[in-house]
């Protein structure tokens, strides 16, 4: 079974862009984007639908996190593509328990490079996501399950130092 996650993330960005610019429902914005191969893959569709639903259902919360870290920017001034890349990555970090945060951030950076809405999109996306991730981690909001999903290096080092 082929993994389509990068392509699905790109399709999600395209769907979010369509939703932002046109008065259409989610199905209309997404159905034409998916290849038959993707649509026929239950795992691909599960990932796609879960991530789309998470972005839409939690958009206000996600946007609050973005606004908190873009205090010099009005949300309406952030490029639509960049804003939706941030939304997608944050939804993944917060609501996809099986995806490591570093993967979500890296995928967002790579997609920002590909879509390249501005010259500095990838750096902007990286900086904002890194700041939000650090806040969420400090607040204990990152809930991941499975090995390697959260970098526990700092906490291991702190435990090691306290045992001396």
UniProtKB/Swiss-Prot annotation:
InterPro entries: NusB-like_sf, NusB_fam, NusB_RsmB_TIM44. SUPFAM superfamilies: NusB-like. The keyword rRNA-binding does not apply. One of its GO terms (cellular component) is cytosol. The keyword Transcription applies. Keywords: RNA-binding, Transcription, Transcription antitermination, Transcription regulation. CDD domains: Terminator_NusB. It comes from the Bacteria. One of its GO terms (molecular function) is RNA binding. Pfam families: NusB. One of its GO terms (biological process) is DNA-templated transcription termination. Involved in transcription antitermination. Required for transcription of ribosomal RNA (rRNA) genes. Binds specifically to the boxA antiterminator sequence of the ribosomal RNA (rrn) operons. Belongs to the NusB family. This is Transcription antitermination protein NusB. The lineage of its organism: Bacteria, Pseudomonadati, Chlorobiota, Chlorobiia, Chlorobiales.
């Amino acid at each position: 079974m082929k993994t389509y996650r990068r392509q699905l993330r790109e399709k999600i960005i395209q769907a979010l862009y369509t939703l932002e610019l046109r008065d259409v429902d989610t199905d209309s914005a997404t159905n034409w984007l998916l290849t038959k191969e993707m649509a026929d893959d239950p795992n691909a569709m599960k990932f796609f639908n879960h991530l789309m639903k998470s972005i839409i259902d939690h958009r206000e919360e996600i946007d609050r996190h973005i606004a908190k870290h873009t205090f010099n920017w009005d949300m309406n001034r952030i490029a639509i593509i960049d804003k939706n890349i941030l939304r997608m990555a944050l939804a993944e970090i917060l609501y996809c328990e099986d995806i490591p945060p570093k993967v979500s951030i890296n995928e967002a950076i790579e997609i920002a490079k590909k879509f390249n809405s501005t010259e500095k999109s990838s750096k902007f996306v990286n900086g904002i996501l890194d700041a939000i991730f650090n806040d969420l981690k400090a607040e204990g909001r990152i809930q991941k399950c499975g090995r390697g999903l959260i970098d526990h290096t700092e906490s291991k080092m702190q435990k090691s130092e306290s045992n001396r």
